[in-house]
Design a protein with these regions (language model features):
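Hydrophobic/basic alpha-helical segments enriched in Actinobacteria
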Residues: 13, 67-72, 79-80, 85, ...
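Glycine-rich catalytic cores of cysteine/serine-nucleophile enzymes that process amide/ester linkages
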Residues: 82, 86-98, 155-193
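N-terminal capping segments
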Residues: 33-118
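Low-complexity, Gly/Ser/Thr/Pro-rich intrinsically disordered linker/tail segments
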Residues: 9, 191-202
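Short, compositionally biased, intrinsically disordered N-terminal export/targeting signals
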Residues: 1-35, 57-61, 202
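Generic helix-packing signal
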Residues: 10, 71-72, 112-115, 165, ...
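Charged/polar, solvent-exposed surface patches and flexible loops
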Residues: 5-8, 12-15, 35, 39, ...
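...with weaker cross-activation on analogous glycine-rich loops/strands in unrelated enzymes
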Residues: 116-181
């Protein structure tokens, strides 16, 4: 659809909605029109324009990403131990968890840092299954096949991470704890590498 056609349709709709004469300046360029249209559609939850990379999600999701981006590269000491002084801090965000696989500790820590703690009492979880079961009960789970937003948790069978961004072609970029014994950035196809679902915390 051309810019002129789109503007004509917008003008017609405005006339129907507001029968009194209204003087409005139309955007001078296609870029201004696109920005105005995006701004108007954002509150309705409409998807970004085609070709756009989803780089920001909810405020809670953005806060989670702000917490975890500096953690990329944090590694187990020694490798294969599921532990380090920093991983011990992630573990403290869960109730009574011991040394063990720590991807769920990491997302529990990140959510707590972002002010949206996981669990009915904010206790966090040491097991992926517990995170997803809580999210389903709390109405925060999204099914496999959904399009995630940055900051959403991405859940697999026995592993969990955080969506960093989603490319226009559906490619999903993540940050994950306990991935190759460290906090790592990974990339998956639009199916999230077989993700079983997502969790949107805010």
């Amino acid at each position: 659809m051309s810019l002129e056609t789109a503007l004509a349709r917008v003008t017609t709709l405005q006339t129907w909605l507001q029968p009194q004469p209204v003087q409005q300046a139309l955007p001078a360029t296609a870029t201004q029109f696109s920005a105005a249209l995006q701004g108007a559609s954002a509150p309705m939850g409409l998807a970004p324009t085609a070709g756009a990379t989803a780089t920001s999600g909810t405020p809670a999701g953005q806060a989670i990403l702000n917490a975890i981006r500096p953690e990329v590269g944090q590694a187990e000491q020694p490798p294969g131990s599921n532990d380090s002084p920093r991983i011990a801090q992630y573990r403290q965000a869960t109730a009574g968890s011991g040394v063990g696989p720590w991807c769920a500790y990491f997302v529990s820590w990140a959510a707590r840092q972002a002010g949206v703690p996981i669990g009915d009492t904010g206790q966090g979880f040491g097991r992926v299954d517990d995170v997803f079961a809580w999210a389903q009960k709390a109405g925060k789970a999204l099914p496999a096949g959904s399009t995630p937003s940055p900051g959403d948790l991405i859940v697999w069978d026995e592993h969990i991470g955080v969506v960093e961004r989603v490319d226009p072609d559906g490619t999903i970029h993540t940050i994950e704890g306990n991935s190759s014994d460290r906090v790592s950035q990974r990339t998956y196809g639009s199916d999230g590498g077989g993700a079983v679902g997502y969790v949107r915390l805010g």
